[in-house]
Amino acid sequence: MSNQRSSLKHLNTFALPAYASNVISAGSVETLIAAWHESKAKRQPVLLLGEGSNVLFIKNFSGTVLLNRIMGITSTEDSAAWYLHVGAGENWHQLVCHSLQNNMPGLENLALIPGCVGSAPIQNIGAYGVELKQVCEYVDLLDMDKGTIQRISAEECQFGYRDSIFKHRYGNGFAIVSVGIKLMKSWTPTLGYGDLIHMDPLTVTATDIFNSVCTMRRSKLPDPMVTGNAGSFFKNPVVSAAIAEEIVHCYPNAPHYLQPDGSVKLAAGWLIDQCSLKGYQIGGAAVHQQQALVLINQSEATGQDVIHLARYIRQQVAQRFSIWLEPEVRFIADNGEVNAVEHLS
């Protein structure tokens, strides 16, 4: 569209070419509210964006992109825990580093997850056996229409696997402005995944885990500053014990993780790899050579290139395993977020 003047290429880690009518950086609640009402008066859609690390622009955006840049970290403590109040615009990995530098362990398994703190509850980010829901105490949510802030308890957030109430009830018109983190002083290491299983729980430190997680992530995940990507493109599928048993019977080395409710989580990257898709390319988009779960901007890819590649991957995995992968990445069209699964079906 001719009125779309603001490039979003530097605002999404896929580095895809996309444009918006306007981009506003908001460092305060007041700026968020003012920009929201101005866009509403113009009858333009608004997209709230953090660091753009989990979005796929499949079309140009027809309205205003509002960058949440509310900063600040404060901490208090009692005999049982440390309590951090963190602005939504803070970088997640820098928060992890800050907590460890101040001898507050508990976030180390979540090191190097891209994005900002405000995006973390939306996805209920997780890695190496730890999810945000285990450390989140509350989320402060701004209703931009009313100009009011309400505190949502962790229980009210309805956290699920890469899911929360913020993807459903509190979508358009709401902005996360801060997140409360609670880190227990009775720290115990979580060592169930990857190279962490080789560590001694009696002697390991939070810094040891942090360093190991950083090494693992850097070895298999491309740096978005070098190669455009949005991290894990698909969710790891959670299936019934019966389906998992069938797959493990045919593929004894298939990674699988029993869940508390008796279901089993499978590794989406492994499923894709079994279809021999590493390096597979459509247009400018490709499957990463080291980690099949990551789709990359190989050479001037468009959003449609990524869509076509993701659709092909889903079909190949479904053909082989009768499992339909669901995207973890959020799909953004001209008026805002759209249903990713429907778009790939």
Swiss-Prot record:
Against InterPro entries, the record matches this protein to:
FAD-bd_PCMH, FAD-bd_PCMH-like_sf, FAD-bd_PCMH_sub1, FAD-bd_PCMH_sub2, MurB, MurB_C, MurB_C_sf, Oxid_FAD_bind_N
Q: For this protein, what is the EC number? A: 1.3.1.98
Q: Which cofactor does it need?
A: FAD
Q: Where is the active site?
A: 162, 232, 328
Q: Any idea which UniProt keywords this protein has?
A: Cell cycle, Cell division, Cell shape, Cell wall biogenesis/degradation, Cytoplasm, FAD, Flavoprotein, NADP, Oxidoreductase, Peptidoglycan synthesis
Pathway field: Cell wall biogenesis; peptidoglycan biosynthesis
Catalytic activity, per the record?
UDP-N-acetyl-alpha-D-muramate + NADP(+) = UDP-N-acetyl-3-O-(1-carboxyvinyl)-alpha-D-glucosamine + NADPH + H(+)
UniProt keyword annotation of Iron present = no
Gene3D superfamilies in the cross-refs: 3.30.465.10, UDP-N-acetylenolpyruvoylglucosamine reductase, C-terminal domain, Uridine Diphospho-n-acetylenolpyruvylglucosamine Reductase, domain 2
Subcellular localization(s) per the UniProt record: Cytoplasm
Q: Which residues form the FAD-binding PCMH-type domain?
A: 16-186
Q: Do you know which PROSITE patterns this protein is assigned to?
A: FAD_PCMH
GO CC, sorted alphabetically, is:
cytosol
Broad class of enzyme this protein falls into: oxidoreductase
Q: Which NCBIfam families match?
A: murB, PRK00046.1
Q: What does this protein do?
A: Cell wall formation.
The similarity comment for this entry is: Belongs to the MurB family.
Protein name in the entry: UDP-N-acetylenolpyruvoylglucosamine reductase
Q: Which organism is it from?
A: Yersinia pestis
